[in-house]
């Protein structure tokens, strides 16, 4: 059975938590798909998350028991920030089990979708973020639509002839690719792309490792032939 999409009528107010970037972002989303409150804290995730949540709930005049769902960034991004946010959400949802609805979004998919929203004719573009030395998380954009989140290596980036975007991470293992346009991560624009939200049974984080052995390449897929 297909998972139910996010509904602003039944799943709000929703607490949005994003620890993937250089700062911790927290927001409270209301029924009109607009922010009731936003709080963004710089500094280490351990020191920033709870003050950001407290500030957002205070501005929205809500308590955790009144939250209908948790929306979180699954990554890729700061491993420490993502894990800390995941543990916090799991703890809070146990306090209010009837409200334990989880919706996830991918940081690269969010950024790629915003590129397409701002420039609907975007094509032959590549968005990358640092994963580890010699490897990058990447989303290819074609026909104004983002593809899947995959892993590419330095060679693919060096040979890329289209427009290249780079999404900075809290801690990078390598310098941004030459000729890449640096993006500002914008989780505050999430209400513009709520279709990205995926229902989860539990708080699950994105793992780049599952794509290592199926790296995306710019070549067209060729049909596999076998000798019978």
PLM features: what roles do these ranges have?
Residues 36-39:
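Short amphipathic
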Residues 41-57:
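N-terminal phosphate-binding loop and adjacent alpha-helix
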């Amino acid at each position: 059975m297909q998972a139910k999409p996010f509904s602003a009528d039944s799943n709000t107010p929703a607490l949005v938590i994003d620890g993937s970037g250089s700062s911790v972002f927290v927001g409270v989303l209301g029924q009109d798909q607009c922010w009731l409150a936003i709080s963004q804290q710089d500094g280490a995730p351990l020191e920033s998350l709870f003050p950001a949540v407290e500030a957002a709930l205070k501005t929205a005049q809500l308590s955790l028991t009144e939250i209908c769902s948790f929306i979180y960034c699954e990554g890729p991004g700061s491993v420490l920030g993502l894990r800390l946010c995941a543990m916090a959400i799991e703890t809070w949802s146990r306090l209010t089990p009837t409200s334990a609805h989880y919706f996830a979004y991918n940081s690269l998919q969010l950024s790629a979708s915003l590129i397409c929203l701002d420039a609907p004719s975007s094509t032959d573009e590549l968005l990358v973020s640092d994963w580890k030395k010699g490897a990058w998380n990447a989303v290819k954009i074609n026909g104004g639509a983002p593809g899947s989140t995959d892993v590419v290596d330095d060679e693919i980036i060096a040979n890329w002839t289209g427009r290249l975007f780079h999404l900075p991470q809290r801690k990078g293992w390598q310098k941004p690719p030459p000729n890449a346009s640096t993006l500002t991560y914008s989780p505050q624009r999430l209400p513009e792309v709520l279709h990205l939200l995926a229902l989860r049974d539990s708080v699950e984080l994105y793992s780049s490792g599952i794509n290592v052995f199926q790296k995306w390449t710019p070549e067209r897929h060729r049909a596999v032939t076998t000798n019978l």
